[in-house]
Amino acid sequence: MAEQQQRAAELRSLLNRAAHAYYVLDAPVMEDTLYDRLYRELQQLEQADPSLLSADSPTQRVGKAPATGFHSVEHRIPLQSLDNAFDHGELKAWHERLLKVLDRADDSPLPLVGELKIDGNALALSYRHGVLERAATRGDGSSGEEITANVRTISSIPLRLQIDDPPEWVEVRGEAFIPDDTFAAINNERAAHGDALFANPRNACAGTLRQLDPKVVAARRLDFFAYTLHLPSDHSNSPECQWDVLAWLEQAGFRVNPNRELCDGLNGIERFCDRWEQQRHQLTYATDGVVVKLNDLRLQDEAGTTQKAPRWAIALKYPAEEAPSKLLKLAVQVGRTGAVTPVAEFEPVALAGTSVSRATLHNADRIAELDLHLGDTVVVRKAGEIIPEVVRVLPELRPTGAVPLELPDHCPECGSNLVRDDSEAATRCINSSCPAILRGGLRHWVSKGALDVDGLGNKLIQQLVERGLVRSIADLYRLDAALLASLERVGEKSAANLVAALEQSKQQPWHRQLYGLGIRHIGEVNAKALAAAYPNSASLAAAEPESIAALHGIGPEISSSLQQWHANPPNQRLLEDLRAVGLSLEANTSELNANSTGEGNSSGALLGKTLVLTGTLPNLSRSDAKTLIEGAGGKVSGSVSKKTDYLVAGEAAGSKLSKAESLGVEILTEAELQKLLST
């Protein structure tokens, strides 16, 4: 038995080293035939004695499919997005903001790291004692889908870190992608089988990662570049700069993009960006820009983050690809607030790997600015290689007698006159019964940030409105399962589930109901502030505009919007209808209790306090903790600074803990936070 254990360990080590040399270093050290023979030997040993199986065995890269799809997991450390710059001017403006945040008055350059921005899919890899424990997609940044079985098939991701005495945990972040030649082979195979082709490698990669069968993932040969990591705060010899982070990742067995550069200040970074803008088409994978990072990790912590992105990094996106096309039509879309958006429809063109045939024109002013005529040849590009836009017209190619384009005078959905307020650029339909406004309002009411009703998608909403079954939000709650089941593509079970979900949504808190009403200028954050100050719709409707405007973060624009909305008779009837079908439109007991210790009570324990969360709390998810803190009048920040009042630290707290200790910030456990909330 001891001999078999030793032999299995030897084989694992040999095969993993060979795989790393082949897939990561691109320097094979073992013949394929020998690799196959040793692989089969290890496989036979493990089959004969399953106790020899280990998580880092190369035979375990392709496992069984998950029984019931993917489940959501919370990231130990959130995956933030990056702010974008689209030219050197915006890059310079970011650099100036960074210098200001760091209070750098001298002229000494800041060392910056330039890394190619891979056009793939972000992954979060969790290692426990050096062994890959979990892999997840970015998701919304706070949580993502757990796809460990699929990620284990990516040969450039080590199943065991190739370092001695690994930390208790390591979080590695990077980008999964499909190389160009692999993508071409995948599409060729799909074409041969009569399957729809993938539009671009990024879409193919995203679809592959969500395959339920890991064998399909393995066959598509995804690749991976690692670009950052997180270690326990007490780990010795942690990297002190981004350049060393990349070296650490390489030493641990990850593939790191070799096309990177440590630059002494902004000028060097600009040269790096210009070079790769010219050379990117020579690469064997897709890249859509350069990521610029402050090299010093201590200064990164000092710079901190906003709610969405780090201040110490930015993505400089390559100039968009452009292509000419013939303008065929001006379409018009009506949104839930009645805003009319003109859309240019043109002959399909290929841009940044996708076929594009439509682009928003935003408003009537943009149509006039471009001087658009039917049949014009227009130049189309993708801003940030994502959003199509018409950038200019080629008037020299304009057909004789071409008719100028302009917005219609009447709503294309209901025929009402369109109006435009002199104070804004938007043209609007002001008919509250307009089907387009109703559809948009229904979609907003059931959206995730509002009442969060599962099972009510766009096509079903379209049916309900077209058949006259729903004429207001309140009508949703008058639907029964039998009626829903009679509609196209709605089964009895789906109908019953939707009725149950609608009934359950009546219990959503008052601030979600307020947000769901879709009042102009009121987002989720403002709705929370208003709901905390006014515990029901009646008190909000009766409030003086000056009192509303005086609330923190509200102001006269929102106050005026609320006053206009409540003065509209159809909206008054809507509130009455919602109460009639069982919506409270008021704060429940738990909300009132939270508000009594929060912004509405000057004695609230966390009123005006700034807290930072780090690590994994034993009982509360990060989102739950944030909700409790905000309910008690506190603010949750993403980074530690001199303005931080408390750091709430859980298991595996990261660098935020050490920074808080160095600044003298008070450290709380979850239990201490709960005690503070209860005072």
UniProtKB/Swiss-Prot annotation:
One Gene Ontology term of the molecular function aspect: metal ion binding
Which Pfam families does the entry mention?
BRCT, DNA_ligase_aden, DNA_ligase_OB, DNA_ligase_ZBD, HHH_2, HHH_5, Nlig-Ia
Give binding positions for NAD(+): D32, T33, L34, Y35, D36, S81, L82, E115, R138, E175, K293, K317
UniProt EC number: 6.5.1.2
The BRCT domain sits at: 601-679
Top enzyme class, one word, equals ligase
- A Gene Ontology cellular-component term: cytosol
The protein's required cofactors: Mg(2+); Mn(2+)
Catalytic center residues:
K117 (n6-amp-lysine intermediate)
Catalysed reaction equations from the record: NAD(+) + (deoxyribonucleotide)n-3'-hydroxyl + 5'-phospho-(deoxyribonucleotide)m = (deoxyribonucleotide)n+m + AMP + beta-nicotinamide D-nucleotide
SUPFAM superfamilies, sorted: BRCT domain (SSF52113), DNA ligase/mRNA capping enzyme, catalytic domain (SSF56091), Nucleic acid-binding proteins (SSF50249), RuvA domain 2-like (SSF47781)
Any idea which UniProt keywords this protein has? DNA damage, DNA repair, DNA replication, Ligase, Magnesium, Manganese, Metal-binding, NAD, Zinc
Q: Name one GO biological process term.
A: DNA replication
Residues holding Zn(2+) = C411, C414, C429, C434
Function statement: DNA ligase that catalyzes the formation of phosphodiester linkages between 5'-phosphoryl and 3'-hydroxyl groups in double-stranded DNA using NAD as a coenzyme and as the energy source for the reaction. It is essential for DNA replication and repair of damaged DNA.
Family, as annotated: Belongs to the NAD-dependent DNA ligase family. LigA subfamily.
Question: Which protein, by its recorded name, is this?
Answer: DNA ligase
What gene does this protein come from? Answer: ligA
